[in-house]
Each structure stands twice: as structure tokens, then as C-alpha cells.
């Protein structure tokens, strides 16, 4: 129905131009607040009434008269009604909705997507966890969000690049090394000589054991072999970082998340990018010295105060490598960049953007985009689960996957807006009933597959069958919802809102179950049976496509 909607919008734009030159850009359809009022709603008449100095209903009547004469409306529209102060409600003919079934079956896995344009490059940075411990459930939410946002924008034709940025040096990494060294020397948390601060989880003992055994670990396309020398802090640091990066990769693999590149913060220093970025800002006249420190004039770009770039002791503040890193993203050709980060990073947004603006590199003011998320609470039997033995102080992503499933974790973590606190209910994730959203959606897909298997015919004929038997209210509602998939993807991508996809899939599953309860599929009448089979096959395809965007499987059997 996508082509039909375009034809109708084109006719609406022409009619609006006839009413008021320049008004064609107001051509748009909305979903009626009450489904019984129609399939599309249009508010353009109310927008035009004031400049035309007319009563909105009078403008709506004039617009309706023009639409009734448009060939596209004559062919595909059953009724045009005016309601309230000037709403125009449009009801489509059954044949218009039936076209959706053909479009879905013809496009298959590509339904709702745009061809990839390699000139539109987008980079999404997410997870970006420092290698100091296992990934926690907050990282899991970030992994699910980042991967789904990448998938969403890929459906819109963008060439998407997934990147993981982490720090392999600094205070946290030093703490990791001293903790591992202490374990390798036989110490444990609570002992007199146990270092403070330290990481106390059992995973530190695992690293120390493998270090002493001189094992080899591979991460980020590099191999590290442990020396076994408990006095060699640099060897311990390198091995511990590689070990935990490998462990994080195993977690991400279990979650079906793959990255195109891993970017080391230390490379920004070794390559001279940090120094060159600072020099660039100096040359642009955007810095000044005060109290022995170097400051950025970030208030010139909307920040609430100027920021220290280089402290009096000669070290850089943490946002300087961030500016250098994002400048590198732009120079690598990524004209669109998105960062998925925890809510605690909110304070860095203005200063990073200010630094990029001050660099005079032609970077847009809103670069990069940010999606900030809250943390996740985990409950079981109504009580919060706070501690993992392996991590020592938090529930890990691997725990959650092992307790439930990767599909459940993905769908659950994507079912709410990122900035909304999420409570992950383990009991609900394990439930095999309609209260479990991922089970409900996957079951709809599996139910359709079982019907198609029971039928056992050639599905390739669905694209040519007579769809006129699909006239019941339930069939019409299902086809209209299938037709909304493309626009839903577009809006979800624009708003970085994979939760919209999860909501749509639940709505589609509910609509399918209602249809299934209302009409038997495998009836004796061959024409009716084939039409209904075509509809449910199209529904299965859209369920499959939407689940794929979320990174969730679509099982054929359950």
C-alpha cells in the first residue's frame, strides 16, 4: 500500500495547492485517534483556515470536493468524511489494503527498507566499556540499543559502522593490574596486604590463574601470552586487559552483537591526535591560559562555563580526548554520529560539541547525537537481585542471558524508552504466556509457520492469488497495520526509538491473534483459503523483519 499512499498524498498536495498556493507541503496523513473513524486522518484544512480567513469546516468541505475528483482517491478511497472542527477522515477500499499483502510478499526481508547509499555514512559508538570487569546489565541495555539503532538506520539506507571505544590505560586499568597482581601472589579480598582500591570479583582470580599458567588470549585481532612474572606490572596489565576484552567479546557474541572496529583511547595520544586537536583549538583562538591551566572558550558555544583542557600539572582533562576522537570520526567521513551512553554522561554533551564547533572543521552544531539510557534493575520472585558472585558487586549481562535467553534480554531491554528506568523481571522473561512480550510475538510467528506447514503447499503462488475474500473487519485491520510498518521504521529511526518497533510488534501479534480467533485459515473453499494464507504469510514476514531489527530470532516452532 506504500505506492497507494504516495499517490494519495500527491493528490492531496495538488488539492492543497489549488486551495492555497504553497500549501502543498502540508500534505500529510495521521492515524485517527479512533480506528472506527477511518484509516487516515488529515488536519490540513484546520491549518489553512486562518490564512484563508474561512471557517475550518468550510475549508475542509472545499478540500473534500477536490479530493473526490482526484483519480487516486476515486480508485482507492471508499469514503471521505468531515468530523469535528475540520478533521478529514479517509476510509480506504478493501482493495487498497489488500495491495499491502502483495507488497510484503514481493519484497520479503526487504519490506520496509531503503537501498543502501554508501555516501550516507553513519557511525554508532556503544557499549565502550573499559576492560576492568564483566559487562553488566547496563552495558547489556546499551548493546541492545546500539545494535537496534544501527539496524534501524540500515533499513533507511544508511551505511552504518559499529564502533567500540575503550581506555586501555589510566587509573582504572592500574587498579585492575594491582588487583590481578595481588591475586597472583595468593592474596584475597580482606587480607592485610590487599590493595585499595581494588576489584574483588572472582573474575580477578581467573585472570591471575591464567597469567601464572602463561596462557595466551586473543582479543581485538591481537594475541597476548602471559609471562607469569608477578613483578612485571606491564605484562600483568596487558594480559588482564586482553583477558577481559576477550571475556567481553564472548558476552557480546552470546548477545549476537558484532562491532566493525575497536578504537583505543591510548591511540589518540600515541598518534598525536590529542596534541594536534589542542593546537588546532589554540590556532583558532578558542583557548586561553589562566591559573597555569589551558581553558576552552566553551561558553561561546552554549556551554554553561568554560572548561579546563589542560591542567596545571600538564595532564589533559577527560573531555579533550573525546573531542579528538569525535573530530577523527568526522574526518573519517562519518557525517552522522550517534553515541549510546549512560545518563551519567549528560554533562559531557555540551563541552564535546563546543570543542568540535571551536575546531572550525565544518561540523554541524548538533554533532554527535546522543542517546542516553538509565540503568536496569533485576528482580526475581519480587525481590531485587543485586550481586553476582562472578562480578562481586553487580549482575552481569552473561548472568541475565544464562538465566533467561538472549532473545528475552534483547526484547525486554528494548521495550521501553532508553531514558526510562527498566525493571527486568526474570520470572516474566521465563513465562510461556501472553504476559511475556517476547514470547507473545514469537509465538505469533511460530503459529503462522505451523499453519503454513500443515497446509504444505507452494507459497510462491501467494503473490498472484485473488485477495478479495479478505474483507472482514479483522482482516482489514491486520492489513492496515502491515501497511504502517514502513512509516513506523522511518519514525523509529529518526527518533532513535527501537522501543517503537517492540511496541509495533506486540500490536501486530495481538492483531494477528484476533484475526486467527475470528477466521479459520485452512477452510475448504480454495480461493478463501489461499487469500487467508497469503495474509498470514505476509504477517509472518513482517514479524520476522521487525524482530530482526531488534536482533531477536523468529522461531518457526515453539
Curated annotation (Swiss-Prot):
Cellular component terms per the entry's GO annotation: cytoplasm
Entry's Gene Ontology BP terms: arginyl-tRNA aminoacylation
Domain of life according to the entry: Bacteria
Top-level class of the enzyme under EC nomenclature: ligase
GO molecular-function terms, A-Z: arginine-tRNA ligase activity; ATP binding
Documented EC number(s): 6.1.1.19
Record field: catalytic activity: tRNA(Arg) + L-arginine + ATP = L-arginyl-tRNA(Arg) + AMP + diphosphate
Keywords annotated in UniProt: Aminoacyl-tRNA synthetase, ATP-binding, Cytoplasm, Ligase, Nucleotide-binding, Protein biosynthesis
Motif ('HIGH' region): 129-139
InterPro entries: aa-tRNA-synth_I_CS, Arg-tRNA-ligase, Arg-tRNA-synth_N, Arg-tRNA-synth_N_sf, ArgRS_core, DALR_anticod-bd, Rossmann-like_a/b/a_fold, tRNAsynth_Ia_anticodon-bd
Pfam families, per database record: Arg_tRNA_synt_N, DALR_1, tRNA-synt_1d
Compartments, as annotated in UniProt: Cytoplasm
Family annotation (HAMAP family): Arg_tRNA_synth
UniProt record similarity statement: Belongs to the class-I aminoacyl-tRNA synthetase family.
Assembly and interaction partners: Monomer.
Protein name: Arginine--tRNA ligase
Organism for this UniProt entry: Polaromonas naphthalenivorans (strain CJ2)
